[in-house]
């Protein structure tokens, strides 16, 4: 509608700005994370879906059963309360069978808790973010390591 002149955009959501990668996350990184949490979590979800796709390809190469993982793929990147009850057993089975995906889902929930814990001080939240980044980089999962590096490059 904007291209034909019927509407005019007055406000646009801010985009996540990426700068130089910092050695450790600081308060500015935390502010950028909280301000752009939807974009950050969408990027994380893309990483989870890609890891799941890679896992399916690996299983297909070995002629293993991929039905459980395919059924759970849709729900792996969602919050636990958003997953329907009939999908819970498949999701639990897929997480138990694939520890890398389970680690990514667990780390996603830990990252989400950073902006839900409003009772903690900025210093404590920054320390939690630094610890999260360190655990993500030491996990041995390439997608988590890349996401952590990208997160440390975020700026407000």
Regions found by a protein language model. Give the residues of each.
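Acidic/histidine-rich catalytic cores and adjacent linkers
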Residues: 2-32, 38, 42-156
């Amino acid at each position: 509608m904007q291209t034909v002149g019927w509407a005019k955009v007055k406000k646009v959501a801010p985009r996540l700005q990426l700068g130089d990668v910092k050695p450790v996350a600081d308060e500015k990184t935390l502010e950028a994370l909280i301000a752009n949490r939807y974009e950050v979590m969408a990027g994380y979800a893309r990483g989870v879906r890609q890891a799941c796709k890679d896992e399916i390809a690996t299983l297909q190469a070995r002629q293993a059963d991929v039905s459980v993982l395919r059924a759970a793929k849709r729900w792996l990147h969602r919050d636990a309360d958003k997953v329907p009850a009939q999908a819970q057993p498949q999701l639990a089975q897929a997480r138990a069978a694939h520890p890398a995906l389970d680690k990514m889902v667990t780390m996603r929930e830990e990252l989400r808790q950073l902006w839900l814990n409003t009772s903690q001080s900025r210093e404590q939240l920054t320390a939690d973010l630094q610890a999260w980044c360190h655990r993500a980089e030491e996990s041995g999962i390439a997608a988590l390591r890349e996401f952590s590096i990208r997160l440390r490059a975020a700026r407000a």
